[in-house]
Amino acid sequence: MASELLPPPPPLPKLPSTTTMATITTTLSADGSAATTIITTTSNAITASTTSTATTISSLSDDDLREIFLRLPDLPALVRAALTCRSWLGAVRSNPAFRRLFRALHPAPPIGFFLDLTGPTNPLFVPLRPSDSDAIAALRRGDFFLTSLPHSFCGWSVTDCRDGYILLWNGMNNLGGNDMSLATLNPMTWAVDILPLPGPGGIEAGSSNNFAVLGFHLQCSDEKPGVFRVICVCTDQNMVRAVIFSSETRDWVIQPWVDIGENNSLKFRAGSLVDGSVYWPCHGKGRMVRINIGTLDTSVVDLPGQVEVDGYNFKAGETKDGKLCIVYQSGLSLDVWIRSMDGEGAEIWAPQSTHNLSAEIDRITHAGHLHGYIKMVQVRYGYVYLSKTCMTLAGMQHSWFFSLSLETLKLELLHEGKYDGYVHLYVMAFPPSLVADDGSTGHDAEGSH
């Protein structure tokens, strides 16, 4: 339990002071000798202390505190400050606008990633910040080995990581069957939620033999910890449909099929969730499908003329300030566009930058002589995450995992090792103790990590 700051000390009391004055008188007698007389006078006086009004930390208003908190370097520093006392915690919990601004100014970097492995096994977690004491402390407390998941013969596979939660599946080839499960897991709290599945045949109703599930996405609520939606995207020839699960209603809503105008060219696990919409690129085409989760509107977005989606060379994502962007890789060159408005209010793709990665990647990997390929992993919070995989001369597979800032164009090596597969970044979310979704100020919240 966080303790309150001590109140300012009371002013010093008025204390009596004693003043002593001595008078020395010297006289001469008739015989010439000197006589000295000392007269001492003592008086008591009241001396008043001077009290000045000073500003102390306990006299700061909530607005002043929040202005100071915005200057903290990161989320762990804010957590430590907020849990110092009840009034500081209340200043954070009572103001959603402050939390949104803090998230925008201090986006939390990923502390690691989950790597899907082949075979019936759970994903492997790879830490990215071994020198960060806050990240290491979080990893030690959390369930990053996924031991709280129920046993699955097929193993679990990560499909999305967002706001501190992981979305996992198993038995993907038989959606709705007895061997299929969906689960969310918060490694920091060890909380597991096994989700109910759509009713038999409901998700496939109205489809042909070309029905397929493309993947799942997780949408969380910043201000309601534990509240989330799961978006399942399905395809059938030239049609797509979204099936949405709500953690509040514990039910799935199956949307109608929408004709996107051409045969199926949407690939497994290729989608991105950006600002409340799912974007799925059309393989071999210059466009992508957009599904707005809020309005349930499905539309097609044309891409810049030079973009041709092929495998892992394209990803939709978000800039640091939350704008939709796309990143296209051709050879070792990355092109970036941001969704903007022209002078007439029409949506356009505004070119942002072109960056040649060849020299920088070769300098870092010393593998320019090896044949390999680049895979676009994710574009989030203004960073492009990508990997390069090569086959060494000894016949061993080796991979490097990078981040590229869209703002500074700085390439940074995050990890290297003998791995390949689907990578899912994990970012810590705001602790529930700092969020009040019931209007409370959090005076009874307990301090923790």
Which residues does each PLM region occupy?
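N-terminal entry/capping and adjacent linker segments that precede and initiate structured domains
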Residues: 1-449
